[in-house]
């Protein structure tokens, strides 16, 4: 798995977060938008909240 894929997940998540609330974003939407498999998402993150934690920690 590449850093590019992980960054694509983060970028897609941030784009979605700008348009709707966190509780309305699903893993399925993220992977469909990225064009990746759900297993790829779960390789990097346990769930949406794990992704959010990664985004917040890298922003600081």
Indicate residue ranges for each PLM-predicted region.
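An amphipathic alpha-helix adjacent to DNA-recognition modules
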Residues: 3-6, 10-14, 18, 23-27, ...
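The alpha-helix within a helix-turn-helix
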Residues: 31
């Amino acid at each position: 798995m590449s850093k590019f894929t992980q960054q694509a997940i983060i970028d897609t998540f941030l784009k979605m977060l700008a348009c709707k609330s966190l509780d309305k974003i699903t893993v399925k939407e993220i992977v469909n938008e990225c064009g990746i498999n759900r297993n790829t998402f779960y390789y990097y993150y346990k769930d949406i909240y794990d992704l959010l934690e990664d985004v917040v920690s890298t922003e600081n």
